[in-house]
Curated annotation (Swiss-Prot):
<dbReference type="InterPro" id="IPR008278">
    <property type="entry name" value="4-PPantetheinyl_Trfase_dom"/>
</dbReference>
<dbReference type="GO" id="GO:0019878">
    <property type="term" value="P:lysine biosynthetic process via aminoadipic acid"/>
</dbReference>
<comment type="function">
    <text>Transfers the 4'-phosphopantetheine moiety from coenzyme A to a Ser of acyl-carrier-protein.</text>
</comment>
<keyword id="KW-0963">Cytoplasm</keyword>
<keyword id="KW-0479">Metal-binding</keyword>
<dbReference type="GO" id="GO:0008897">
    <property type="term" value="F:holo-[acyl-carrier-protein] synthase activity"/>
</dbReference>
<dbReference type="GO" id="GO:0006633">
    <property type="term" value="P:fatty acid biosynthetic process"/>
</dbReference>
<dbReference type="InterPro" id="IPR004568">
    <property type="entry name" value="Ppantetheine-prot_Trfase_dom"/>
</dbReference>
<keyword id="KW-0444">Lipid biosynthesis</keyword>
<feature type="binding site">
    <location>
        <position position="58"/>
    </location>
    <ligand>
        <name>Mg(2+)</name>
    </ligand>
</feature>
<keyword id="KW-0276">Fatty acid metabolism</keyword>
<dbReference type="InterPro" id="IPR050559">
    <property type="entry name" value="P-Pant_transferase_sf"/>
</dbReference>
<dbReference type="GO" id="GO:0005829">
    <property type="term" value="C:cytosol"/>
</dbReference>
<keyword id="KW-0460">Magnesium</keyword>
<dbReference type="GO" id="GO:0000287">
    <property type="term" value="F:magnesium ion binding"/>
</dbReference>
<dbReference type="Pfam" id="PF01648">
    <property type="entry name" value="ACPS"/>
</dbReference>
<feature type="binding site">
    <location>
        <position position="8"/>
    </location>
    <ligand>
        <name>Mg(2+)</name>
    </ligand>
</feature>
Amino acid sequence: MIVGIGIDIVELHRVAELMERQPKFIERILTDNEHIRFQQLSSKRKIEFVAGRFAAKEAYAKALGTGIGTHVSFHDIEIKNDENGKPYIISPSMDERVHVSISHSEHYAVAQVIIERLSS
């Protein structure tokens, strides 16, 4: 059963500006493991990566119904990729499956998250 759906879209140029003006922005958004992956990317891909992770984490928090803040922070959410490159979020609840999709265009990054309860 679906228990939450979230979506978020961000403008790449705004993320690029934040990354340039506020170096701590990246540290605030990415977990340590995500930051390791980030360091391996080209400049253009770094912007897309941060924007995509930001959008996915916001979408996840929206699907939870809480938003980013008191109950969940950016560092509570880690997005990994499977062997085929498909992104996934590990839910702290063993009772849930989290589906995530991240996409980029020339100007935007967008993410959608669906949280599914496994037990009834």
